[in-house]
A protein has these predicted regions:
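Compositionally biased terminal segments of proteins
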Residues: 1-188
Length: 188
């Protein structure tokens, strides 16, 4: 639930704020899988892995202040006050936050990965929400979900694996435009 108590999720607002502050990050998790075209249920949060250098964490802290981020807890729907700076952000491996724009999780070293630099190597930049968005490679998302082993992650694995196979096949066997045109004319 968001700070305002609504069920709204505004990924565009969160991403635009991160980008405006120059935060270096990679989107991970369900939203990243959806941006790759995986047909999984729509997510209500954003998970990111930020670069951990001090300057980037200071920019992230400024973005979190602008987003009015608070620590997410089941007992306090609007979240707990969250005083932070770059140094304090680096003291945890995960921050589960809530904002007026939706839930926002920071995972510095997602399961099955070595963190930002590891994910960045194969990340893709996609245009979404009117922004350029760095998104973890689908195979890295799969690797992380397998390592985490949570029931909700295991549930999505068959869909993610199928999507990964489809994307790999499209990269390895691109069809020529005239083949697509012929298929359309024939009703294929």
């Amino acid at each position: 639930m968001t700070e305002s108590g609504s069920e709204e999720f505004d990924a565009a607002r969160i991403i635009a704020t991160l980008n405006r502050h120059g935060v270096r990050y990679v989107v991970i998790g369900a939203l990243a899988a959806q941006l790759h075209g995986a047909p999984i249920p729509r997510t209500r949060d954003i998970d990111v892995t930020p670069a951990t250098d001090r300057d980037n964490l200071e920019r992230l802290s400024a973005a979190l202040h602008e987003l009015r981020a608070r620590i997410r807890t089941a007992d306090v729907p609007e979240g707990l006050k969250f005083d932070h700076d770059g140094a304090s952000l680096s003291r945890a491996r995960v921050w589960n936050l809530t904002t007026p724009f939706g839930e926002f999780d920071l995972s510095f070293v997602p399961s099955g990965t070595e963190g930002y630099d590891d994910l960045l190597r194969r990340a893709h930049t996609v245009e979404a929400y009117g922004e350029m968005v760095p998104v973890a490679d689908l195979d890295d998302i799969i690797r992380s979900k397998e390592a985490a082993g949570r029931p909700k992650d295991i549930l999505h694995l068959p869909i993610l694996l199928q999507t990964s196979d489809r994307l790999r096949d499209q990269r390895e066997h691109p069809r020529r435009e005239n083949e697509r045109d012929t298929d359309l004319e024939l009703g294929s």
